[in-house]
Design a protein with these regions (language model features):
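Central beta-strand plus flanking loop segment that forms part of the substrate or channel wall
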Residues: 52-87, 97, 103-107, 113-117, ...
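Short gly/ser/thr-rich secondary-structure transition/capping motifs
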Residues: 27-31, 149-158
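Conserved mid-domain beta->alpha element of the FAD-binding
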Residues: 153-196
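Short Gly/Pro-enriched turn/cap motifs at secondary-structure boundaries
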Residues: 64-67, 87-91, 152, 159-160
Length: 196
């Protein structure tokens, strides 16, 4: 996508860049100021900047939603058995555990669980975490043989009260955050982008 963007004459890539402020212009479009001081006007400002969207905040679009009282623990892991380019999911009493295939033979895991268990799993060393994950997944792909950096984030449902304003559109997690079960957040984000 980035390479295709570089090829388009009407696209100017500003990368890396971070948004400082944005405001609607009287003549239409949005004026944007970056943290490095650069400013420009755009006919369409797309907020694709995640659940804590700065674009949504600057556009003064409120959200509604609730907490699932769970955390998602995420990491990339390597398993003893090949994933066969198949996504796997196991439903545990505390929430689903998903193994999503990556192109290099690793899996991306999303382990939805209680905040307490997520914190306990994060506190484990790599060996003990790999053992806990292997057991939770019932050795379906053999032993977990390598664990990348781990992180966790709280799970919540969140919807922007508006997805569009004149000259502005919110897509992906900036517009709507859903439980990671079955990867619907990714699917919704891709549909948002295709709709634009």
């Amino acid at each position: 996508l980035l390479e295709r963007g570089r090829q388009l004459p009407a696209v100017e890539l500003l990368c890396p860049a971070a948004l400082e402020s944005a405001w609607p212009e009287d003549a239409g479009g949005w004026r944007v100021r970056l943290t490095d001081g650069r400013e420009f006007t755009t006919r369409l400002l797309v907020g694709a900047d995640g659940a804590q969207s700065k674009v949504r905040e600057l556009a003064e679009i409120d959200t509604r939603g609730w907490s699932y009282h769970q955390k998602a623990l995420v990491a990339n892991v390597r398993t003893a058995e090949p994933h066969q380019e198949t996504a796997w999911q196991r439903f545990l009493p505390t929430g689903p555990l998903a193994f999503l295939p990556l192109h290099d033979g690793r899996c991306s895991i999303v382990w939805s669980t209680t905040p307490e268990q997520a914190d306990q799993l994060l506190a484990l060393d790599e060996y003990n975490f790999a053992q806990a994950l292997t057991e939770a997944f019932e050795r379906r792909l053999g032993e977990i043989v390598q664990v990348g950096p781990r992180g966790a984030f709280p799970l919540r449902l969140q919807h922007a009260r508006a997805y569009v304003k004149p000259g502005l559109a919110l897509i992906g997690d900036a517009a709507h955050v859903v439980h990671p079960l079955a990867g619907q957040g990714v699917n919704l984000g891709l549909l948002d982008a295709a709709t634009l």
